[in-house]
């Protein structure tokens, strides 16, 4: 069996990692991970044929030659290798988690820090037990600051990811009604996210906290954090902010000891105010000039269908269909209500991973949508469909049924909110809007 130290020597010579034979590049290291429906040990030979330098496997019968490296467990080896690499990096690592806004906040932080530093940030949402190790192993030795996104759907997952990423600084964007099934309810969500605070307490790291969020204050007090940097709209904050406008893009005023500044970002949604303020706070902490902070924010444009305002031939569409939970859905509906438009349309899909709370949460969101007095309501998915007799609007069990309806009933000159869980794939409706 090969040790982590020996495997690291291979990594130094071949620093590109692949876990999928469809993404093999010449001289990469192929890690043969297992999934529910596959065992990549069976693809080791194919990976080598396609140009991988070595295949890391945990089943000896697939060791076809000396380029197959046998380890006790491939996932464990990947995580241990990432942890070993992290130990060689003497840089600040900002660990980031939360129920909503993780990826947008990560990208905002990266945009601000990149005004002064060479920054690595998690690509996309590689934020789980596989994605975090892959992210850490993507940090080259010329990187000056790293921003690592950490996601979780059950307790002890953030704690485990912290042992790999070893953040020196941290931020929880918020805690909300997300992954309730895995966490065992909202209190479980709070406990799970607070594992980042517990780790930062252990290593005496810095924590950035939105003072206006009572849950974060409660969690930070329970953790007994020593080094806190506050941002918010009230109280004694290192960075204080004031929302000026949200129609359609966010404009805010922010201040600290040296002065007050204004910035208009390319983000829609009141809920992004605190995400922008977090990036400002972290930029200021790392000694980036106010003008450069604003420059980074102005030059950031959302991607991956998170709060993107898209102008189509017929409508203005808020593309927020990357994911959804009750907290983010409520925020999106409230945001739509606050925006100016002659005609407003809501198209929302089911929210997943809510467990026993699913019926209650979908019923509440349907009521909020109805009470918003929007011009058109379209609900998609079996969870929403269960309440079709209790609310006005169009209800469809499947996206396919909704597609057929939209193909026959044109929506035009409207401000449209398009939002649902990733599995609903509501982006497929966008061409009809």
Language-model features and meaning:
Residues 33-38, 303, 322-392, 421:
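Active-site beta-alpha connecting loops in nucleotide-dependent enzymes
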Residues 1-80, 84, 268, 337-341, ...:
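N-terminal leader/targeting and accessory segments in enzymes
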Residues 58-65, 171-316, 341-342, 367-376, ...:
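Acidic, Mg2+-coordinating active-site environments of NTP-dependent enzymes
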Residues 96, 304-306, 423, 427-429:
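ATP-dependent carboxylate/acyl-activation modules
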Residues 28, 47, 81, 96, ...:
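Residue-level signal for inorganic ion chemistry
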Residues 77-211, 215-224, 283, 404, ...:
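Phosphate-binding loop of NTP-binding sites
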Residues 21-32, 119, 134-145, 333-355:
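Mobile, glycine- and charge-enriched loop segments
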């Amino acid at each position: 069996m090969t040790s982590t130290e020996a495997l690291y020597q291979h990594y130094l010579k071949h620093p590109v990692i692949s876990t999928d034979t469809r993404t093999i590049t010449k001289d990469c290291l192929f890690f043969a991970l297992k999934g529910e429906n596959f065992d990549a040990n069976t693809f080791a030979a194919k990976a080598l044929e396609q140009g991988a330098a070595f295949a890391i496997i945990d089943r000896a019968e697939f060791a076809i030659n000396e380029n197959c490296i046998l380890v006790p467990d491939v996932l464990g080896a990947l995580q241990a290798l990432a942890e070993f690499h992290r130990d060689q990096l003497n840089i600040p690592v900002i660990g980031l988690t939360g129920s909503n806004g993780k990826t947008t906040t990560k990208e905002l932080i990266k945009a601000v820090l990149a005004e002064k530093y060479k920054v690595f940030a998690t690509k996309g949402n590689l934020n789980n037990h596989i994605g975090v190790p892959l992210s850490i192993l993507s940090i080259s030795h010329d990187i000056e600051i790293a921003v690592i996104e950490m996601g979780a759907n059950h307790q002890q997952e953030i704690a485990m990811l912290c042992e790999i990423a070893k953040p020196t600084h941290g931020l929880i964007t918020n805690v909300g009604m997300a992954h309730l099934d895995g966490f065992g309810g909202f209190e479980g969500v709070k406990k799970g996210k607070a594992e980042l605070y517990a780790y930062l307490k252990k290593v005496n790291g810095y924590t950035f906290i939105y003072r206006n969020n009572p849950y974060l204050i409660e969690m930070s007090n329970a953790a007994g954090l020593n080094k806190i940097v506050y941002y918010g709209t009230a109280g004694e904050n290192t960075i204080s902010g004031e929302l000026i406008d949200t129609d359609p893009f966010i404009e805010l005023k922010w201040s600290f000891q040296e002065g007050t500044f204004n910035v208009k970002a390319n983000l829609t949604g009141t809920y992004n105010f605190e995400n922008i303020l977090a990036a400002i706070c972290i930029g200021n902490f790392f000694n980036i000039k106010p003008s450069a902070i604003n420059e980074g924010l102005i030059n950031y444009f959302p991607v991956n269908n998170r709060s993107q305002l898209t102008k189509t031939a017929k409508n203005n569409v808020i593309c927020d269909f990357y994911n959804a939970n009750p907290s983010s859905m409520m925020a999106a509906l409230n945001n739509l209500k606050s925006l100016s438009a002659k005609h407003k349309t809501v198209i929302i899909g089911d929210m997943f991973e809510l467990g026993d709370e699913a019926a209650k949460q979908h019923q509440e969101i349907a009521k909020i949508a109805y009470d918003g007095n929007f011009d058109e309501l379209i609900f998609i998915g079996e969870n929403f469909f269960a309440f079709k007799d209790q609310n006005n609007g169009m209800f469809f069990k499947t996206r396919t049924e909704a597609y057929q309806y939209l193909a026959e009933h044109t929506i035009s000159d409207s401000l449209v909110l398009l939002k649902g869980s990733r599995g609903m794939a509501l982006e497929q409706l966008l061409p009809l809007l």
